[in-house]
Structure formats: C-alpha cells, structure tokens
Amino acid sequence: MAGTGVVAVYGNGAITETKKSPFSVKVGLAQMLRGGVIMDVVNPEQARIAEEAGACAVMALERVPADIRAQGGVARMSDPQLIKEIKQSVTIPVMAKARIGHFVEAQILEAIGIDYVDESEVLTPADEENHINKHNFRIPFVCGCRNLGEALRRIREGAAMIRTKGEAGTGNVIEAVRHVRSVMGDIRLLRNMDDDEVFTFAKKIAAPYDLVMQTKQLGRLPVVQFAAGGVATPADAALMMQLGCDGVFVGSGVFKSGDPARRARAIVQAVTHYSDPDMLAEVSCGLGEAMVGINLNDKKVERFANRSE
C-alpha cells in the first residue's frame, strides 16, 4: 500500500451514498492523511507537541489505551469540552473515539465539529451485535480490523479508513503485525484467483462480493489502511509501513515514554523514511526509555481486538 498509486474510490455504485456526504468524499478526506502519523493526546499541551513533531492528526482522549487497561472499568467517549479544547489548540485534524455501536456518541462528536470518528474497540462496546451505520454521517469514520473480511464489512458500513486493531496500550506490536499480514496475505491470494472463485472466497470471509471483487482489481483495500495497536518505536512504525500500511497510529507509545517530544519526531521521521535503514538508525538513537510493554502471552491480558467482529 505504501508507495503505491492514488487510492481508488468507489465509482460503480457499490456503496450507497447518502445526502449527508458522498462516501467518495469521505474516502478522499481520509486519503489526505496517507503517509502520516496520528497520535493519541489527552490535553492541549500534548496536542501541540504532536503537531510540532509533524503528526498529520491527533486523537483526542481522556485516557490513553495504557491507562484504560490499567484502570479498567467502562471506557466511554471523552468529555466533549476536552475535545473542543484540544481542537482549538492545533491546526491539524482532530479525531475522537466513539464506542462500537454507540451512534449517539458519534452524533455528539459530529455536532462539536470533530474531523474524524474512530469507532473503537479500545472503548467498551455499547452494542455487541451492531456497528454504527456510518453512511448516516457527514464525517469520515475509522474502524479496526484483524483480517480482510472484517475490513470489508466495516467498509460496507461506511468506514472511510481501516486500521489494524493490534492491541492498543501494550507497547507490543505483534498483534498489529499479525493483522496486517492477514489482510495483505488474503489480498495476495485474491489477486491470483479466477473470477469464478471470488464468490466462494467472499462467502468464506463473510464479506460483500462486490467489495471483494473491487479489492481483487485494485490489489489493495479500497480505502487507506493504517497500522495501530502497540507501535512504540520508530522501528515499529517503519516495520508497519514496509508491510504495506499507508500510515500509523501511535497511542501510549509516545506520551508514556521518557522523552515524548523526541520520540514523536522520530516516529514521524521513521514513517516518512521507512525504507531508509540509515535514517531509521539515526532517528532511533537517544530517545530515552520506551514505554513499559505488556507480554501478550499472558492469558490474563484482555484482548481489545476480540471485542467485535
């Protein structure tokens, strides 16, 4: 995905466009973030640090995923006042998270002028069966996935950007790698299939046939795909780009580290120069202590990625 041509948008009527905002417009807005880093922030000061480091957008939160894991309880949409304060402090786009299936939280976020909504498994799901109908909103939505079928189901619902779910708040990139390799592996298989095999494959992965065929023709997802969940170092970020992602979300990895400003700049540089080992070595030096990671082999660790299908 990284380093390929312009991301195609739907032109064949595959997705129903609402009067609120055509899907192609939302896909175009998401595409503007391609090649960038989106950073979680919990206050205006952190937002300014992220912007100065070169982030293409920030995610406004009350608690970063590492704190959500540590503190437990029910994680909900952030206070709209905090989101407004963060939005007023920067000139780059601001995202915010809504609970899976909680369309009223999404309505509130749209009403306060947020730029993108992340329907996120990091927050406690509000609906175990249904995701938000994202076609009912003007603003673009981001959704997570673990595999190609999940990605295409979210796109059918109106997601304009897909990210790996990974395991946010762990500082451990293994699940993000697993998820992007799963998506990319299925796309490689799909590209080599005869057209008459696509029906069976679409049924197997429980994805809409027209989107599966479009993915086959494009050789990639029809929307931008970012990496998320456990990215903590410049090397992690470059790894995800080399695996084919269009950009990177960084959550706890920046502001839970020893020198957030320096690490933020380094990760932005790593995403920009992801294929240059000399540059990656340079930006990886002297960053201070990385966030404390979590071993995902521990069965007691809650898997956020399993909260939805």
UniProtKB/Swiss-Prot annotation:
A Gene Ontology annotation in the biological process aspect, one of them, is: pyridoxine biosynthetic process
Name the positions where D-ribose 5-phosphate binds. 40, 169, 230, 251-252
Q: What CDD domains does the entry give?
A: pdxS (cd04727)
Q: Which Gene3D superfamilies match?
A: Aldolase class I
Domain of life of the source: Eukaryota
Q: Which InterPro entries match?
A: Aldolase_TIM, PdxS/SNZ, PdxS/SNZ_N, RibuloseP-bd_barrel
A GO MF annotation of the entry reads: pyridoxal 5'-phosphate synthase (glutamine hydrolysing) activity
Q: What induces it?
A: By stress treatment with salicylic acid and ethephon.
Q: Which residues form the active site?
A: 97
Its annotated function is as follows:
Catalyzes the formation of pyridoxal 5'-phosphate from ribose 5-phosphate (RBP), glyceraldehyde 3-phosphate (G3P) and ammonia. The ammonia is provided by PDX2. Can also use ribulose 5-phosphate and dihydroxyacetone phosphate as substrates, resulting from enzyme-catalyzed isomerization of RBP and G3P, respectively. Also plays an indirect role in resistance to singlet oxygen-generating photosensitizers.
The record's similarity note reads: Belongs to the PdxS/SNZ family.
Q: Under what name is this protein listed?
A: Probable pyridoxal 5'-phosphate synthase subunit PDX1
Q: Which organism is it from?
A: Hevea brasiliensis
